[in-house]
Structure formats: C-alpha cells, structure tokens
C-alpha cells in the first residue's frame, strides 16, 4: 500500500500524481494487441505532454501524434524519433508546416484542399517532397460526447470521400507531394467498437481504390479514441479492436498506425487535494477543496464524472451526499455532485481519480492560480516531473510592459 502520509510531509497539495508502471503497461497492451503485424503506436500528446511521460514512452519505441509544433518539439526533446511523428490538426500555420517539413517527420495529416496546396508551396520553397496523409471524414457516429465527436460530416475535421480522391490525385501529380497514408479519427472516449470497425472498412475500401489508381500508400492511420471506464462502463478490448482493424485491412499490406492518448495515461493519474472547509447552505452540503477547475477542467467542460476517494482515515464518520467544489469564482467549479463522502475536516486529503488524461494538459492560470506540481511514482519512488509554478511565474512575461508605464 502506498504511503501517502510520507508524501504529504514533503509536498503540499494540490498536485498530480502519476503511476508510471500503469502507463508502461497500458502502452505495452497496445503493442501486444498488434503483435505480428506491421504497426506503429503514436501516443497522442494532447492527452498529457509531460516530458517525463513522453520519455518513458520513447524508451518503449512509441511514436507521437502531434497537433502543434510545440507538441512536435516536446516529442523530439523527450527522445521520440522524427520518423515516428505524425502531425495532425485542422489549423496548421505556414510556420508550423515549414518547421515540421524541416524536421523530416513521418508525415502530415492533411485536412483540406487549401492546406494541401499550402504544404505543396512550402515544400517547393524548401526544395523537398512532403510526405502527406489525407484525413477522411467517414461520416460515422462515434456515439460519444458531442464536443469530442470528430467523424460526422458536420464536424470540422477531415474531408469527404470525393474531395479526398481529388486531393490524392493532385498530390500524385505534384513534384513536391508524396501521398503515403490514409487517415481517419472519429472521436474520443469511444466505448463502442462497431463505429471504429465501420470506419476502418469504409476507409480501407477507399485505400484499395487509391492503390488501384497507382498511389503508393504505405500506412493506414486509424486515429485513436479508445475510451476508459470512468463510471464502470464496459470498455473496448484491445484484442477485439486490433482484430477488427486487421480484418478490415485484408488484402492490404499497410503499416497500421493508431494514436491512443487517453487510454494510455488516464488511469495512471490522481489529483490529490485537501479539504479547506465544509459548509451547508440551504440544506446543501459542500466540501471545498484547494484544487480548482483551472487545475482540472473535465468535470466543468464535459460534465465528466471522476470518482473521489478519501485518503485521510475516516472510519466511523457519518456519510452523506455532498458537492465537492473548488475555490474558483464559477458555479461550474465542481468536481463531483452528490458524492457520498464521510464528514470531512480541514486538512483531510482526497484523491480525484483517473485524471492522467486531459488534466494537466488542459490546465490554466485562471484566477491567477499557478499551475500544479506533478509527481511520478516509479519503482516505488516519487520524483518531481513538473515543478509547481511560483506566484512570480504568473506575471513574469508581463513585467517588460510595465517599464513604459
């Protein structure tokens, strides 16, 4: 059993704590699922881009799915090889495209005809041939939260089949473009395998048509999105996931790329926070803690529910419903409504569970609150992987502006 009391003697709350053994095992589970088939697991940095986490994955020969030049540079700094990096996203700037091409990453996932022509122009100016993939929007309902659904025609992501064909033919004729992959990604936190298989089958059929037209495809990028169990939901079995994709690709000798993020890191992380006060207002019980929505946004943004565990011994205390809330001046600064917790006292510690994905990566300094300390548990030892910001860090980049006042 992990000794939290020793941890609290050294580190003040709130902080993130990650179990690196869980991250390692989650990644290896993907490698095992695709064992025996040409594949590349590109971890999606958007889920959590801490350098120490990336370094751990780099040592396991992970690739990287990046959506900004900042993420690409993070991946490289952590030791992920350029030939294992793919660059996705609907709004790549010309600067980002140029930098990615200079770094010679594996390929860019292209999301519009205008972007394709921009890449071509930049590649021509550099005197190189840009490896590209085209993201196809298969118009399939991923059955997930609308904010993280990306595979329907009303979503901003990818292009339809007809436009994709036109883009591939354009790229084939270009002296500065090299089409090497097809790509789709239908959403995040997916708990139903059927939409993924349906999308794989649909895009595999397109890939066969492209190959028949003389386009030399080498990769089949299925995106990511496998969900985790936040509320005891049944999740997708990775063996079934891999077999479904492999079956869709029968007759195609392509390297499979998948881009998991949440399912690699979510279950590894806890947000450790302490009780500041308890209050009752009009028969409503509130537990006020020292972490806020700026530290962990998912409950406020997505109405996501994360289990809360009391760390401080509380045997014998009366249990009753309460809302666990933070100090930020928003009514949405709520971690969990109607949580059944024992009576809590100032200084008691609680853990918000499964926050390793889209926790620290979505954090902000809202209300001028410094970003949190991040710790790793590895080989039964604790180490700091991100220092807590100091108050002075909040305005450090603004001080120059005061000189002219």
UniProtKB/Swiss-Prot annotation:
Active-site annotation: 329
Listed GO biological process terms: lysine biosynthetic process via diaminopimelate
Pathway connected to this protein: Amino-acid biosynthesis; L-lysine biosynthesis via DAP pathway; L-lysine from DL-2,6-diaminopimelate: step 1/1
Binding site for substrate: 262, 298, 302, 330, 358
GO molecular function: diaminopimelate decarboxylase activity; pyridoxal phosphate binding
Function: Specifically catalyzes the decarboxylation of meso-diaminopimelate (meso-DAP) to L-lysine.
Protein's name in the database: Diaminopimelate decarboxylase
Native organism: Helicobacter pylori
């Amino acid at each position: 059993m992990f000794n939290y009391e020793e941890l609290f003697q050294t580190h003040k709350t709130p902080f993130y704590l990650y179990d690196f053994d869980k991250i390692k095992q989650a990644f290896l589970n993907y490698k095992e699922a695709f064992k025996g088939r040409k594949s590349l697991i590109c971890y999606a940095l958007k889920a959590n881009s801490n350098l120490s986490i990336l370094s751990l994955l780099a040592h396991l020969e992970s690739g990287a799915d990046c959506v900004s030049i900042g993420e690409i540079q993070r991946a490289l700094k952590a030791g992920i090889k350029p030939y294992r990096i793919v660059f996705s996203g609907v709004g790549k700037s010309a600067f980002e495209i140029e930098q990615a091409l200079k770094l010679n990453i594996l390929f860019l996932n292209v999301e519009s005809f205008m972007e394709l022509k921009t890449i071509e122009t930049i590649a021509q100016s550099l005197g190189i041939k840009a490896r590209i993939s085209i993201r196809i929007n298969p118009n399939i309902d991923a059955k997930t939260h609308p904010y993280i659904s990306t595979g329907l025609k009303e979503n901003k992501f990818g292009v339809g089949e007809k436009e994709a064909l036109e883009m591939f033919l354009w790229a084939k004729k270009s002296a500065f473009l090299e089409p090497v992959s097809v790509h789709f990604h239908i959403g995040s936190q997916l708990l139903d395998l059927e939409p993924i298989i349906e999308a794989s089958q649909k895009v595999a059929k397109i890939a066969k048509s492209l190959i028949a037209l003389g386009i030399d495809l080498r990769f089949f990028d299925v995106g990511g999105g496998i969900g985790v169990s936040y509320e005891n939901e049944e999740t997708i079995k990775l063996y079934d996931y891999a077999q479904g994709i492999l079956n869709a690709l029968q007759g195609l000798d392509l390297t499979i790329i998948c881009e998991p993020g949440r399912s690699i890191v979510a279950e590894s992380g806890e947000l450790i926070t302490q009780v500041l006060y308890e209050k009752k207002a009009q028969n409503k019980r509130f537990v006020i803690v020292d972490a806020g929505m700026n530290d962990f946004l998912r409950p406020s943004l997505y109405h996501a529910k994360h289990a809360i565990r009391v760390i401080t011994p509380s045997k014998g205390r009366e249990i009753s419903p309460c809302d666990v809330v933070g100090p930020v001046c928003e009514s949405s600064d709520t971690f969990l409504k109607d949580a059944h917790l024992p009576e809590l006292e100032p200084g008691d510690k609680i853990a918000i569970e499964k926050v390793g994905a889209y926790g620290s990566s979505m954090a902000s300094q809202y209300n001028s609150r410094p970003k949190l300390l991040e710790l790793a548990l590895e080989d039964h030892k604790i180490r700091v992987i991100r220092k807590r910001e100091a108050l002075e860090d909040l305005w450090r980049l603004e001080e120059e502006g005061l000189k002219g006042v």
